[in-house]
């Protein structure tokens, strides 16, 4: 596969795409075509957390570099992002970063602790804490801008996905001080001081939007908004406290010319509301069949998902049967991007992922489907 032809500088850093895609343009790739509900030569596949601890080459690079530091070094971001594309032949790369990178750039003191995740030094409890979260621009995250431009040149026709954390999930980290099982402090603030909650979520929406615009201006072909913890909410609470802020982010990208993917874990009952927030593609975890998800999000949106990450530890005949099932259910959607229902687990055998990619490409080959 010719994945490494360098693109001309005329195709990088253009922001909104006004011209139609040309042959070899990532905008005409199977991934972007599926996002736009257009036919393509096969069902595209990539994996959340495909650049990560399942790869020995990733573990080697990260052995002596802290997580947050690795997210601030363009040469490391570039190499780590490329690793799964080289190894697996996936249809899209996703920028290596972490959802707390933009809030750190906005002045929040935090670290990413091995085995724990993001830990915030001074959790948000007051309006003064919210006021200390400053706006960001390209100058605050130059390493992201540089890495995206490098990657677009390296990837050629393979699209690069940019990403950011959604306001609710970021707010939960900032309020709880780190990962939380029940999000008790987050919900207490949300219910008890809704004005403060909306002020925080609105500020984080501004930071997230700015972070995604940096990536789009540098040349990413799509973006994904991760709302990892949204499944902790009822639909009523989601619509009241969360949807307006995710909608602000996605609406701010409406004229950017790239597909917008919206994903959360445990959000089967929220899929319609997440789609209504402004997504072109709604990510689905493994709990909800894709044909059911398609009915919930409607015919105006593609779906992404949704193999259970744990199934990759099963015998190959079981994996193959489940891949076939997901593909069959995905045919109910106007566009389907194959993915896992959450991130690749660290213990996953990378050879199994490579085999899954090859199987999907073989089973869905449609050489004359492009139109």
Swiss-Prot record:
The keyword Cytoplasm applies. Residues 1-30 are annotated as: Disordered. Gene3D superfamilies: 3.20.20.210. GO terms for cellular component: cytosol. Its main location: cytoplasm. The keyword Cell division does not apply. Keywords: Cytoplasm, Decarboxylase, Lyase, Porphyrin biosynthesis. Pathway: Porphyrin-containing compound metabolism; protoporphyrin-IX biosynthesis; coproporphyrinogen-III from 5-aminolevulinate: step 4/4. Residues 1-14 have a biased composition (Polar residues). Transmembrane segments: none annotated. It catalyses: uroporphyrinogen III + 4 H(+) = coproporphyrinogen III + 4 CO2. Homodimer. Belongs to the uroporphyrinogen decarboxylase family. This is Uroporphyrinogen decarboxylase. The gene is hemE.
